[in-house]
């Protein structure tokens, strides 16, 4: 009877031991983008506010229950007037759509490349988005106090067409490129 009781006590530990919850570290992330400007050069920008979390199944090496939220009014291109224009209804329309979200449906992880298939919701329109990247490292963080958390580092890239989300400003004349290159770098802390 005692043996059965001990097994029942350990069952939740055994069941949940292989899944780790992670929260994106807001001080170690970058979501950047590149967009063509009149064919001369690409403009580099980024979003400075993000929230996100996910679960990592260590036994099967899969990522689940993910949710990434990007604050659209955090757009930054190092040019105040351009940033104001990007926040206007011509582009991000931040007063109506204060957030864009990404949720992965399928994540294939191997040693060489991680492929993340998901759904990006931008301007209220949800479209598929595939990101290509890799998990750089999962280990105890080398800095900090006595308790050093486990951290996962991820790099990823992808491309979206802004017209797919109804963002049509200057697409027709190719003054602002339709394709947006995404560059994502972040660390997430195991909870």
Give the ranges of each region predicted by the language model:
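Sec-dependent N-terminal signal peptides
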Residues: 4-14
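Low-complexity, acidic/polar, glycine-enriched regions of mature
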Residues: 17-191
């Amino acid at each position: 009877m005692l043996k059965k009781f001990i097994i029942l006590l350990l069952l939740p530990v055994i069941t949940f031991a292989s899944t780790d919850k992670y929260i994106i570290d807001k001080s170690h992330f970058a979501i950047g983008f590149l967009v063509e400007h009149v064919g001369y050069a690409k403009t580099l920008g980024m979003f400075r506010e993000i929230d996100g979390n996910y679960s990592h199944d260590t036994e099967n090496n899969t990522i689940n229950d993910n949710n990434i939220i990007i604050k659209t009014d955090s757009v930054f291109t190092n040019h105040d007037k351009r940033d104001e224009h990007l926040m206007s209804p011509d582009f991000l329309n931040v007063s109506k759509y204060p957030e864009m979200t990404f949720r992965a449906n399928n994540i294939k992880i191997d040693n060489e490349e991680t492929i993340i298939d998901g759904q990006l919701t931008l301007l209220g329109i949800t479209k598929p988005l595939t990101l290509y990247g890799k998990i750089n490292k999962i280990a105890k963080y080398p800095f900090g106090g006595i308790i050093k958390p486990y951290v996962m580092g991820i790099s990823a890239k992808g491309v979206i067409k802004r017209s797919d989300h109804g963002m049509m400003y200057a697409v027709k004349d190719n003054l602002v490129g339709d394709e947006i290159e995404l560059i994502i770098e972040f660390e997430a802390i195991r909870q």
